[in-house]
């Protein structure tokens, strides 16, 4: 991905995120081309929650949908399926809350600091300032991004198939 989407671009120490949050509340100007330390921390939280959802979904059962069960429910005990299902449902609600907070933070950023974050996410262009994290973004190849997506899908589907799960 582009330089601002790489993990190294938004992986900050916890105290850096806390310090940034304090600076934000005190309206001390700090500008980042990519995610700021607090936003980067939330990205890692979101990635962890989505990964947990995906993993738990493999072993969950839902009789309220046409899907009924994850592809690996037949490989574990009923107690494990019940536990995975409870956690899957609970974590979904947590995930929605964190997503909502992340979106609300973007709007708060626009109001509090008068800096648009949504527009640059859509257009890929951000007004030039003195950025703390990097001087300018290095755009990656769209073809390489597509190849990575295809490879990731193949790894996931192949893993499920190798584990004996059903796809589709």
Predicted regions and their residues:
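Membrane-embedded alpha-helical bundles that constitute the cytochrome b-like, heme-associated redox core
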Residues: 1-168
